[in-house]
Amino acid sequence: MTPPSDLVTVSVTVSTDPATAFVLFTQDINLWWRRGPNFRIAGKQPGVLRFEPRLGGRLLEEFESPSGPEVVTTGTITEWQPPARFRFEWRGVNFAPGESTQVEVVFEEVPTGTRVTIRHSGWAALPPDHPVRHGQQGPAFIRIMGLWWGDLMTSFREFVTDRAGS
């Protein structure tokens, strides 16, 4: 069992079927994922965030830096089961070699559409003074990560809603 200080769980319900939600989440991630230094390595600079949609594919961020074009791999897909779920190994830009966390994204049909659930775990394996924690420990850090994922899932829900209205 995963300890409570190791797991972030956030769910949102979107008004579309699981197959469409899966495609919008994975293929249109650059359109709904928030911008700015809290959400993208490139910060406010123009760039593209995208999944390579397959087992072993990557979550990439491509952008122009002062030293030229950059491509940063933030994740590697470890399970790919459209339209039900996928998992990827997530690495922050300040992670050392061998450090990673795991993100699972599940798409479940519900009467009002699709429940999309994010489970982000593996935090307990990182040292208490790891830079990704920004000085926060245990439950306080998990709360911050829950708010971060909550902001992203709100963006996803708004994106799906706007798309359905157009």
Give residue ranges: language-model regions.
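Tryptophan-centric aromatic hotspots in well-structured domains and transmembrane helices
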Residues: 25, 32-33, 48, 80, ...
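Hydrophobic pocket/interface hotspot
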Residues: 21-25, 59, 77, 88, ...
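Glycine-centered loop/turn positions within well-structured domains
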Residues: 19, 57, 84
